Amino acid sequence: VTTDPLLLTGDVDDATTRLIRTAARFDAADLAQPSLLPGWTRGHVLAHLSRNADALVNALTSARTGELIPMYASTESRTADIAAGAPRPPEEQLDDLRRSADRYAEAVAAMPAPAWAATVQTRRGPLPASLLVWRRLREVEIHHVDLAADYRPRDWSPAFGHRLLHEVATDLAARDDAPALVLRFDGTSHELVIGDRAQAPVVSGPAVEIAAWLTGRSPGATLTVTPDGQLPHPPEWI
């Protein structure tokens, strides 16, 4: 996946189209079914994706204007908005998903080139504006899987899987609760190391499948562990 936000917009558009296609098939009973996220229904996931699009509009507007605009008014309001949006009828969910995605796309289109160099404030700290489009792609692709419909990590592109794997491995390497791991993907010449290599089992497999396992979106049944044994348990990641 490219790091150029403008080139990534096409990937976001395609991912959004796939997401909306899935969401359009849900009736009220489907939306009330559990998602892959503990405590969240499919309705919660869709409401979150809509509010995430609007939060990114705030971040993009902040980068473009120089005004300090928080992505969310507060953690409490973010949680409340998702809870309030979860039980809505299917047609309202779908309309919100489409309209919020359109607002996000318009905010990206309004960005002048210099604005991508700005730094914006997110819930997890400062972030270059140039990474906001990737963040939206990541949200849509991962949470599409969380809908527990027919979209799986195997449907992610290899480029997306590679970038996600590198990002997650980098994040986990900075955490104290992550197990030591050597991640060997797409052949023995490509690997990432988390923690003390000398104490780490080697987990091997396609990059997409390792990324899905590390993010908790797959049990990793197709991965191999050397020396033989069970896969370690990575900590929760988004």
Regions from the language model: what does each represent?
Residues 2-14, 18-21, 62-82:
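Soluble acyl-CoA-dependent acyltransferase catalytic core bearing the H(X)4D motif
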Residues 21, 44, 48, 58, ...:
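Residue-level signal for well-ordered alpha-helical scaffold segments within enzymatic catalytic domains
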Residues 89-112:
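Ordered, amphipathic secondary-structure segments that act as subunit-interaction surfaces
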Residues 2-11, 30-52, 80-93, 120-138, ...:
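Alpha-helical scaffold segments that form or flank carboxylate-/histidine-based iron centers
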Residues 2-7, 61-71, 110-238:
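Structured surface interface patches that mediate subunit assembly and partner/cofactor docking
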Residues 43-74:
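Conserved alpha-helical segments that form or flank metal/cofactor-binding pockets of metalloenzymes
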Residues 15-18, 22, 52, 100-103, ...:
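Amphipathic, well-ordered alpha-helical segments in soluble domains
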